Amino acid sequence: MIDINELRADPDTYRASQTARGADAGLVDRILEADSRRRSAITDFESLRAEQNAFGKKVARAQGEEKQQLLAQVKQLAADVKAAQAAADEAQATQQQLVTQFPNLIVEGIPAGGEDDFVQLRTEGTPRDFAAEGFEPRDHLELGELLDGIDMERGAKVSGSRFYFLKRDVARLETALLMAAQDLALDNGFIPMTTPNLVRPGIMNGTGFDVEHDDEIYRVGKDDLYLVGTSEVALAGYHSDEILDLSGGPLRYAGWSSCYRREAGSAGKDTRGIIRVHQFNKLEMFVYCHPEDAAAEHERLLAWEEQMLQACGLAYRVIDTAAGDLGTSAARKFDCEAWIPTQGKYRELTSTSNCTTYQARRLNIRERLPETTDAHGKVKKGGTRAVATLNGTLATTRWLVALLETHQQADGSVTVPELLRPYLRGQEVLRPVA
């Protein structure tokens, strides 16, 4: 949630943010109008309450006919106070509804526009030249079927389209990938977590997902719970309504979970294989930190993602996502896209988002500010403020697409990156099953 005080002080910056996103800049003015009505309604209520309190003292001193007249006025005043309270509550609810709709304020300098308006920051690694090696690369599904490791047909039979079974070495490769990612996170101070796959609507909304209008979210109607599309949701909710101690540095969590997405708007896209599916596994980094440290922490998350990609021997590029392609909560997002040989293009494997204080405000997650001492030596207890939250993908099932295609050999076997071999009992090659 945005800071209404900041919007009130600098509405033009918020209008510019909305314009860059391709969103409704007029929402700024509707919020300001609602805010003005709210403050006016509160002033009216407080004025009437003060008058009511003053009347109470007059009634106590009055006698006879005067007292009866005052009591009649008190009765009317009580009704006026009640009506003013209702008007103030309604104005507050209207303002809150509008503020809740407003996406995060983008970081200054990120590209404006939509999905195709990103800025490429750099490329790393060189895509393999299969023509020079003398063979045509197979796609990940063909390789997976040769390894008897991906079964889309039975996935569809059991659960429908965009579901699958992973088997044998491919299933082990996925687990190895996630375990290697978890170890990298552990080495960098993350606390490992397994998280709930179902969350309450308040947590889903608090993270920035609109449960009423988001067609990507699976809902369990009887229990009013939602399947998460990322462990970010559960990890953001983990400290909801809490005051955190960040004096020792950022709180970093690495969440391992299954993820669920309806892919409602993806008809006809990536229908072959496991690039775009309804269920997958992911190792997600999630951080709580001081707001002033968020930009530097964002760069660290990106560096860890790149470290993982490089250790897996994948060629990739880093892009600065355009404002119109950001999620509601993100102020800035970097994507790492790996080269997919059979598609001849880069595809997203990781993303990392700086959500500034947006999620923390919605979920009431704060930190205690340090004590201060005034000129007279009097110690004043520190107040509280919203923390910053960030997230980033360290590994996910989709990585198998890039791993299988990048490291394939002419006979259909796949060389295992050195990073993953210890998690596969030293196995160096995945071989086709006869």
Curated annotation (Swiss-Prot):
Its EC number is 6.1.1.11. GO terms for cellular component: cytoplasm. Keywords: Aminoacyl-tRNA synthetase, ATP-binding, Cytoplasm, Ligase, Nucleotide-binding, Protein biosynthesis. It catalyses: tRNA(Ser) + L-serine + ATP = L-seryl-tRNA(Ser) + AMP + diphosphate + H(+); tRNA(Sec) + L-serine + ATP = L-seryl-tRNA(Sec) + AMP + diphosphate + H(+). Disulfide bonds: none annotated. Transmembrane segments: none annotated. InterPro entries: aa-tRNA-synt_IIb, aa-tRNA-synth_II, aa-tRNA-synth_II/BPL/LPL, Ser-tRNA-ligase_type_1, Ser-tRNA-synth_1_N, SerRS_1_N_sf, SerRS_core, tRNA-bd_arm. GO terms for molecular function: ATP binding; serine-tRNA ligase activity. It is found in: Cytoplasm. GO terms for biological process: selenocysteine biosynthetic process; seryl-tRNA aminoacylation. L-serine binds at T230, S231, E232, E284, T393. Pathway: Aminoacyl-tRNA biosynthesis; selenocysteinyl-tRNA(Sec) biosynthesis; L-seryl-tRNA(Sec) from L-serine and tRNA(Sec): step 1/1. ATP binds at R261, R262, E263, V277, E348, L349, T350, S351. Its main location: cytoplasm. Belongs to the class-II aminoacyl-tRNA synthetase family. Type-1 seryl-tRNA synthetase subfamily. Homodimer. The tRNA molecule binds across the dimer. HAMAP family: Ser_tRNA_synth_type1. Consists of two distinct domains, a catalytic core and a N-terminal extension that is involved in tRNA binding. Catalyzes the attachment of serine to tRNA(Ser). Is also able to aminoacylate tRNA(Sec) with serine, to form the misacylated tRNA L-seryl-tRNA(Sec), which will be further converted into selenocysteinyl-tRNA(Sec). PANTHER family: SERYL-TRNA SYNTHETASE (PTHR11778). This is Serine--tRNA ligase. The gene is serS.
